[in-house]
Amino acid sequence: MSDFAIGLLISLSRRIIDNHNYIKKNKWLRSTLELNQSLTNKKVGIVGMGKIGKSFAKKARALYLDIFYYGPNKKKINYKYYKDLKKMAKEVNFLVITCKGGDKTNGIIDQSIINSLRKDSYIINISRGSVINENALLKALQNNKIKGAALDVFNNEPNINPKFKKLKNVILSPHHASGTKETRYEMAKLSCKNVFNFFNNTKPVHKISWPWNY
């Protein structure tokens, strides 16, 4: 999943989809493309430094990005830790959300966090749609309060807010960050392990909640 987030980050900053559409619409030499920005020395704030967050950070560091992170606890890693999410949001060019869904993170990216972001910043979400206040995000994108967003997850999937589809500064993906053969194989193994543990009166590898909070 972390490589998918890296792909979204590069696509946003270097406007790869815009470049693709520029060619398809036969605009080459007829108009100029807006200059985009290099990733070197840009600041990335990761919300949730778990397995996915750590994997993303390692890959992002290889691109010479400066890494910051927010979470409930400081970890023994060589990245700057923020206990205050709002303070981190004010500093970064990219806010990348990799935390778990659930009650503890529901709406964690609220209007105050979004309003704290720089005008040239981006939001990338491969976590759960429930972690973001979608109305606040939509308003920020519509009014160019932030530069853009890349979203792989949404509230009320697959019936996402149709207003997102009309925006030019957002990349949309159908909850497919885990869509590799390798990842799905590991997910299947984990599911089997959970079922095995359940029927053997052993604690599941991960807690399963119902209904799913996406």
List the predicted regions and their residue ranges:
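Glycine-rich Rossmann-fold phosphate-binding loop(s) that bind the pyrophosphate
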Residues: 49-50
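Rossmann-like adenosine-cofactor binding region
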Residues: 73-163
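Phosphate-binding beta-alpha-beta segment of Rossmann-like dinucleotide-binding domains, i.e.
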Residues: 1-43, 55
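N-terminal Rossmann-fold NAD(P) dinucleotide-binding loop
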Residues: 53-54, 110
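Residues at the starts of beta-strands that form the adenosine-phosphate
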Residues: 43, 57, 62-66
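C-terminal helix-to-coil terminal segments
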Residues: 1-4, 18, 35, 157-214
